[in-house]
Amino acid sequence: MKKHKFYITCKHGKDIEVMQREGEILEYTAPNGTILQIGVAKDDTYGVYSLTEISTGCLIPVKGYKYKKLVLKQLTPDLLTQIVQALELARNKKVASVLKKYKDGRKIKNDM
């Protein structure tokens, strides 16, 4: 799959590199190694583009625009960092709940 690079310009510091795969998926690798996949979708009802984090299916809080370029310009380094942090928190909660269920299940079996 062919990837195209584009950069998000920061006011302070260097630009953030984001890869765009063929189609409408963007990939961003955070400094901690977390890979963020963002889907660009056009709403058929209103005819505007929106952004979605693919692994969770959550909409990214940006204003919908008729042009894809205007939606992508709203991706800032701060927003990407917040999305990565929220994604890590959601994953940690999910892992903790699975571990708790597993631990509770073993405890019940051992008591019998």
What are these regions (language model features)?
Residues 1-4, 103-112:
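Short intrinsically disordered terminal tails
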Residues 22-25, 39-41, 92-99, 104-105:
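Non-catalytic tandem-repeat scaffold regions and their flanking low-complexity/translocation tails
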